[in-house]
Amino acid sequence: MLFENSQDNWEIDLPSNITNIGLKISGGADSAIVCYMLAKYVMEERPDITIHPVTGIADNKLYQQKYADSVLRKVEELTGIVFGKHQYKDVTATRYILDQEDFLKSLYEQELFNLHFAGITANPSEDDAPQLYTSINAMPTDDRSKQLIKKDNYRLPLINIDKRGVAEHYTRLGVMDTLFPVTRSCEAKVTDLEYNINEHCEV
């Protein structure tokens, strides 16, 4: 199945021996659209595949389970798919990446799935978002360089597109008014002076 995008197309065609896949989902707009695309692929081409949602709930972002669940229920409503049991675990903010890696490793050891997907996107260019490059704490610290979508046992279908490309996927797939509103697209931490996780961001 081909998902076209002006920044980078994504084609998914999993081998027939892959029948269980993991999906890292936070409740944000990026992982939500990957969730929808995978569900659409499963429903239309590979009904033998089970998608297993995985959420690491950071201690400074306690809303992640709530919004991840909202996304899953909406995608089930839109596609008719039934997800596998939602796997989630509390993780420490200061060890967020390491704790998530350990969590995923434990799920692989249980042979719950053969590979997993994540909704990591590309960073905008410095010309498009100079403010992100002037704040030392603003840019993500994980590797978001332009790279192959396939890497080892995980897949990053959005790694070569930025937030505008994500919005384009929502528009092309016709879910901007149905799926996007149930996502949590802005960052908030429980230590923030204004901790309002119910106010949505604009695209």
Regions inferred by a protein language model and the residue ranges of each:
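Nucleotide-activated chemistry modules centered on ATP-dependent adenylation/adenylyltransferase
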Residues: M1-V203
